[in-house]
Swiss-Prot record:
Coiled coil: 39-68
Keyword Lipid metabolism attached: no
Record key words, sorted: Coiled coil
Bias (Acidic residues): 135-146
Region (Disordered): 98-175
Name of encoding gene: CCDC184
GO-annotated cellular components: cytoplasm
Keyword Iron belongs to the record: no
Name of this chain's protein: Coiled-coil domain-containing protein 184
PANTHER family linked to this entry: COILED-COIL DOMAIN-CONTAINING PROTEIN 184
Length: 195
């Protein structure tokens, strides 16, 4: 039928009809896919920026940790050095000879740096005292010392001081008068009889 109409129109000398313009409406799938692709692209760029910032933070934290580790290593080296020094000092102190004993023996009981006062002779002990006294006076003094007992002689350890209660215990009668108490045996017999 269309071919017939075209033939009639051509025979009459009419012009060919212009083709109908069809509006290009995008398909729903194309719209959805475009929006999806655009959203995913933006999301990927955002995630990429966040990951980059995270990597930068991790790199900074690693540098700080390395610095702290080096500082800790220095401190541990110092501690080890101090410990070795203390151990060596203890060994030296324990193995070193004691010099104080030698000083005491050399100075007859005095410390090495102590001053010694010059010994002054007591009066009467020197040569002048012995020469100035008469031998007869010395014999008289010896006799007087023998006759007079020395008050500074210590008493024997068996001689105990008199007790303050010695007079009371050495008296004629008892200290306390006996009370009139019933005999215990009589009380026991009376108790058995009552049973």
């Amino acid at each position: 039928m269309e071919e017939g109409l075209l033939e009639i129109m051509t025979k009459d000398g009419g012009d060919m009809p212009a083709p109908l313009e069809v509006s290009t409406v995008p398909a729903v799938g194309d719209v959805i896919s475009g929006e999806y692709n655009g959203g995913m692209k933006e999301l990927m760029e955002h995630l990429k920026a966040q990951l980059q910032a995270l990597f930068e933070d991790v790199r900074a934290m690693r540098g700080a940790l390395d610095e702290q580790a080096s500082h800790i290593q220095v401190l541990s080296d110092d501690v080890c050095a101090n410990q070795r020094a203390i151990v060596s000092m203890c060994q030296i102190m324990t193995t070193a000879p004691r010099q104080g004993g030698l000083g005491v023996v050399g100075n007859k009981g005095n410390f090495p740096g102590a001053r010694r006062d010059p010994e002054t002779p007591s009066p009467g002990i020197g040569d002048s005292g012995l020469l100035g006294r008469d031998p007869e006076d010395e014999e008289d003094d010896d006799e007087e010392e023998k006759e007079m007992p020395s008050s500074a002689t210590p008493t024997s350890h068996c001689e105990l001081p008199e007790s303050p209660c010695a007079g009371l215990l050495g008296g004629d009668g008892p200290l306390v008068e006996p009370l009139d108490l019933p005999d215990i045996t009589l009380l026991q017999l009376e108790g058995e009889a009552s049973l």
